[in-house]
Design a protein with these regions (language model features):
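Short, acidic, metal-binding catalytic loop of nucleotide-sugar glycosyltransferases
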Residues: 22-31
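Short beta-strand/loop segment that forms part of the nucleotide-sugar
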Residues: 31-40, 59-61
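Acidic helix N-cap motif at the loop->helix transition within catalytic regions
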Residues: 43-51, 95
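Conserved short acidic donor-positioning loop in nucleotide-sugar-dependent glycosyltransferases
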Residues: 12, 24, 39-44, 65
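Conserved donor NDP-sugar-binding/catalytic core segment of glycosyltransferases
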Residues: 91-134
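A recurrent flexible, glycine/aromatic-enriched loop bordering the glycosyltransferase active site
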Residues: 126, 138-139, 146-170
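Glycine-rich, basic loop-to-helix element that forms the pyrophosphate-binding segment
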Residues: 61-78, 88, 99
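Short aromatic/hydrophobic "clamp" motif used to bind/position activated sugar donors
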Residues: 83
Length: 172
């Protein structure tokens, strides 16, 4: 059995899939299985994956139930001890899975480890480097809009952005 499940929720995201899956195909760490959870898409998403990435496990829902239900279904159907949640509009570095897996394995008490997300529109800016909450209970993305060169070392955060993070199955 692989060590990591990569769960990707989707709704009519065909236009993003070539970039996302091409990057996953180049990973330095290969002990992972990809679960693609489709929320009743009307585009060519599933057909594209069947043709170009047949090793991907496709879970087709009959309607658009949203992010939470989709990722929960992917988690339920996967069995690997670690789960990466990954948005379909991401392009990951070659060591993405490896670094997240190593990061969570080094921190035995960690529930999750988050990747630093770089803005899709402004590639020199951070979109999210972990999440915090203010005194009123409002969540905010750490580092949003800062230069991509910041937040280069591991640090404790309150929560991980579920768009690119790894979780221990035992805590899910």
């Amino acid at each position: 059995m692989d060590k990591v499940a990569v769960v990707i929720p989707n709704y009519n995201g065909y236009r993003y899939l070539e970039t996302c899956f091409a990057a996953l195909a180049k990973q330095t760490f290969t002990e992972f299985t990809t679960y693609f959870v489709d929320n009743g898409s009307q585009d060519e998403s599933c057909a594209f994956l069947r043709e170009h990435y047949p090793e991907t496990k496709i879970i087709q829902l009959d309607d658009n139930y949203g992010f939470s239900r989709a990722v929960n279904e992917g988690i339920r159907q996967s069995k690997e001890p670690y789960v990466i949640l990954l948005n379909n509009d991401t392009e990951v570095f070659q060591d993405f899975v490896e670094r997240l897996y190593e990061g969570i394995c080094k921190r035995k008490n960690a529930f999750a480890c988050s990747a630093k997300l770089i803005s899709y529109q402004e590639r020199d800016k951070i979109d999210d480097a972990g999440n915090y909450y203010n005194m009123l209970g409002w969540a905010f993305a750490r580092g949003k809009g800062k230069p991509v060169s910041e937040f280069e070392t591991s640090d404790r955060i309150f929560a991980a952005c579920a768009g690119a993070a790894i979780y221990r199955r035992e805590f899910l």
